[in-house]
């Protein structure tokens, strides 16, 4: 196998996906995050597998990276990070309910719920999104391929339109880091670089 050729092909394919970047949805997502921050609403983010690690990373970047030195903090929770809770709900109820059951404890009207799913069809993510939408929340989805059910269900759908899970996840992490830097710059107008540590 020619690994150099493989790398070049992978990068070119990723560039093609990024050429179709959904800028308007990206802006909507940033504005929803800033609105939740300004109004003191909670933000819940979740995913499975690689999307779960992206969700966890996203929460860290918002909670620490964007507002460490600000008086008003983000209130962000990753629903896949509390492993004992996830396992308890999965064991005693169903894996499909692991996120929605946590929302029932913490969610309040006006909160923002973000689901990350490569396929857009993860049922546990969809159940949580449905609950949030039915109870006065704002919802966003970050998915891939053609968007899946998630894209049709949320208020703000961002889709990385490529039929390759790894490239979908690549784009999702790029979106997370772009959001972090954009939000940081908005909340730190005195910092000319706009780049968090």
Roles of regions detected by a PLM:
Residues 35-107:
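Glycine-rich, small/polar surface segments that engage phosphate groups of diverse ligands
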């Amino acid at each position: 196998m020619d690994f150099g050729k493989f790398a070049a092909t992978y990068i070119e394919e990723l560039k093609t996906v990024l050429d179709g970047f959904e800028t308007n949805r990206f802006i909507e997502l940033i504005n929803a995050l800033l609105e939740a921050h300004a109004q003191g609403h909670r933000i819940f983010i979740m995913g499975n597998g690689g999307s779960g690690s992206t969700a966890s990373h996203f929460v860290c970047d918002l909670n620490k990276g964007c507002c460490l030195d600000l008086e008003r903090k983000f209130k962000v929770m990753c629903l896949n990070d509390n492993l004992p809770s996830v396992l308890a709900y999965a064991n005693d109820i169903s894996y499909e309910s692991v996120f929605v059951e946590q929302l029932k404890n913490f969610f309040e009207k006006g909160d923002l719920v973000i689901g990350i799913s490569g396929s857009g069809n993860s049922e546990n993510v969809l159940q949580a999104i449905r609950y949030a939408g039915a109870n006065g929340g704002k919802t966003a989805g970050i998915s891939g391929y053609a968007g899946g059910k998630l894209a049709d269900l949320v208020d703000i759908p961002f889709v990385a339109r490529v039929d390759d899970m790894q490239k979908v996840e690549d784009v999702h992490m790029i979106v997370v880091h772009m959001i972090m830097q954009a939000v940081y710059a908005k909340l730190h107008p005195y910092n000319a670089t706009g780049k968090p540590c």
